Amino acid sequence: MENSQLCKLFIGGLNVQTSESGLRGHFEAFGTLTDCVVVVNPQTKRSRCFGFVTYSNVEEADAAMAASPHAVDGNTVELKRAVSREDSARPGAHAKVKKLFVGGLKGDVAEGDLIEHFSQFGAVEKAEIIADKQSGKKRGFGFVYFQSHDAADKAAVVKFHPIQGHRVEVKKAVPKEDIHAGGGGARAARGGRGGGRGRGGGGGGGGRDQNGLAKGGGGGGGGYNSYGGYGGYGAYGGGGGGGGSYGGSDYGNGFGGFGSYSQHQSSYGPMKSGGGGGGGGSWGGRSNSGPYRGGYGGGYGGGSF
């Protein structure tokens, strides 16, 4: 399960006075930090009231998550797994869910196989594989239900998983109303603590990919200028982009566009040695050891701020 992206945590709601040394001083109690940054306005150098820490291994990041809630300089802060730059604009990438969509399932995969695989990320309540109501034929996708949000976040960060020798794709199962179907825009954000009030911006366009999966367009403007509210993180600002949910209709009614998923299973193919990694890589050109400074802007809304 070792994946560098799982070692990276987002910290929101920081005190405007919290420095990088102060942030490091708090979180290094749970392990060795390979990177620590408080995001600031490049012109004013004023804190944007959020930041990131990267641990040397997943176990240390897990320990920090397990110790939540954290209070830093008098503020109770929010911890989440950091979403990679390339995935940050995907609709629902920052959603707080316990349910994941799993696509590209082969016919020999059983619900028990899903439970066994995904239990490495945290306790699984149940798994279901969707079948055609008339024929009973499996439709090539299903859902996994976790007991905690962090377990779902961890599994979603990896993105591609090996199940029965084949690569499957994992996405957060975000309800239609939460993803602003049809490319609806992000809601206006509220200002950060001590950091000024952001303006609500326009929403991005939505769409669908060839599998009928929700495909986001541009992210909503949101607060914190072009950051889209921490790039779509929780209630700190605008959501992360538009897009139709499950192909544009409620998945309870034929699972929307997911019904066509089985037609494209072959695109996943057998797992190859070393395959299946996801969510890693550099943020804006920096190496994994220092993924934020100078590179995070593109993944969290970009633009000037």
From Swiss-Prot:
CDD domains: RRM1_hnRNPA0. Residues 181-211, 272-284, 292-305 have a biased composition (Gly residues). It comes from the Eukaryota. The modification Omega-N-methylarginine is found at residues 139, 286, 293. Residues 7-86, 98-175 form the RRM domain. The modification Phosphoserine is found at residues 68, 84. Pfam families: RRM_1 (PF00076). Residues 178-211, 265-305 are annotated as: Disordered. There is a cross-link at residues 80, 96, 98-99, 106, 154, 159, 172, 176 (Glycyl lysine isopeptide (Lys-Gly) (interchain with G-Cter in SUMO2)). mRNA-binding component of ribonucleosomes. Specifically binds AU-rich element (ARE)-containing mRNAs. Involved in post-transcriptional regulation of cytokines mRNAs. One of its GO terms (cellular component) is nucleoplasm. This is Heterogeneous nuclear ribonucleoprotein A0. The modification Dimethylated arginine is found at residue 293. Its main location: nucleus. The modification N-acetylmethionine is found at residue 1. InterPro entries: hnRNPA0_RRM1, Nucleotide-bd_a/b_plait_sf, RBD_domain_sf, RRM_dom. Keywords: Acetylation, Isopeptide bond, Methylation, Nucleus, Phosphoprotein, Repeat, Ribonucleoprotein, RNA-binding, Ubl conjugation.
